[in-house]
Curated annotation (Swiss-Prot):
Entry annotated with the keyword Protein biosynthesis: yes
Domain named PCI: residues: 46-222
Localization annotation: Cytoplasm
Known role: Component of the eukaryotic translation initiation factor 3 (eIF-3) complex, which is involved in protein synthesis of a specialized repertoire of mRNAs and, together with other initiation factors, stimulates binding of mRNA and methionyl-tRNAi to the 40S ribosome. The eIF-3 complex specifically targets and initiates translation of a subset of mRNAs involved in cell proliferation.
Single GO term (MF): ribosome binding
Alphabetical list of SUPFAM superfamilies matching this protein: ARM repeat, Winged helix' DNA-binding domain
A GO cellular component annotation in the UniProt record: eukaryotic 43S preinitiation complex
Organism name: Aspergillus clavatus (strain ATCC 1007 / CBS 513.65 / DSM 816 / NCTC 3887 / NRRL 1 / QM 1276 / 107)
Keyword Lipid biosynthesis carried by entry: no
Family, as annotated: Belongs to the eIF-3 subunit K family.
Gene3D superfamilies linked to this entry: ARM repeat, domain 1, Winged helix-like DNA-binding domain superfamily/Winged helix DNA-binding domain
Name of this chain's protein: Eukaryotic translation initiation factor 3 subunit K
Pfam families, per the entry: CSN8_PSD8_EIF3K
GO annotation, biological process: formation of cytoplasmic translation initiation complex; regulation of translational initiation
Length: 249
């Protein structure tokens, strides 16, 4: 059974009290939530429900918006893909931060924040569409990307682990060269250490097609034959035929 969306095992008691009370909509709690986002970045935790509450406060009180905190929330959401977290957070950003602002949008608002949101949205699209090599290529293509994820401790490692989880669902065996690109681990030694120590997979160097990585079977990647059959009794045909005669009469 999945964990409820509004639950987080690592959530502090004072944050839980705010989320379950009227103070959730109190602008004075904005700083408390912002400090909690910073804590999540340091502790490698993610509390989507609390982060959405902060973004909702920003939506109600645009003047309180902290661009760095908002982008940190989006960057943290990337580390829990595939999930709706990033899309939900993106949808709650104030109108002037959207890539396509309305005609009456405040022109004084900095465009740097909009650019940052667009870049993070691009990374999210690449991850959600399983374009892992392109994700790393894009991440490494611009120093701004590095700045956007700099506050998130272990960002690259967290993303690699999520990629590994998705790979483990789809493959039983995969070429090491492909994984080097998907994990952005250009050293074979680094790749072998990651897949064996972190993922618990096996490296086979004696394969006919070069080094391959073998993934243990699980309920997602195991091939199963499934036979479906339905029993249709004679009495069912009898009812259909009888109904046809009744309508004709």
């Amino acid at each position: 059974m999945g964990v409820a969306f509004d639950k987080c095992d690592t959530r502090p008691a004072h944050i839980d009290a705010i989320l379950n009370g009227l103070d959730r909509y109190n602008p004075e709690t904005t700083t408390v939530f912002q400090d909690y986002v910073a804590q999540q970045c340091e502790d490698r935790t993610f509390d989507c429900y609390a982060n959405l509450a902060l973004l909702k406060l920003y939506q109600f009180n645009p003047h309180l918006l902290q661009a760095e905190t908002a982008t940190n929330i989006l960057a943290k959401a990337l580390t829990v893909f595939p999930s709706p977290a990033f899309s939900l957070c993106l949808a709650l950003l104030p109108a002037h931060t959207q890539p396509f602002p309305t005609a009456d949008a405040d022109a004084s608002q900095t465009s740097d924040f909009v650019e940052s949101v667009q870049k993070l949205a691009r990374l999210s699209t690449l991850l959600e569409s399983a374009q892992y090599a392109q994700f790393w290529s894009t991440l490494n293509s611009d120093d701004l990307y590095a700045d956007l994820v700099a506050d998130v401790a272990g960002f690259e490692e967290l993303v690699r682990i999520r990629i590994a989880v998705e790979v483990g669902k789809a493959f039983r065996e995969i070429n090491a060269e492909v994984l080097e690109q998907w994990f952005d681990l250009r050293s074979r030694e680094a790749l072998e250490k990651f897949v064996t120590e972190v993922c618990g997979w096996e490296v086979d160097k004696a394969g006919p097609n070069g080094t391959v990585v073998k993934v243990p079977s699980n309920k997602e990647n195991e091939v199963r034959s499934e036979v479906k059959s339905e029993h249709v009794g004679v009495e069912m045909f009898g009812r259909v035929i009888r109904r046809g005669f009744e309508q004709a009469a």
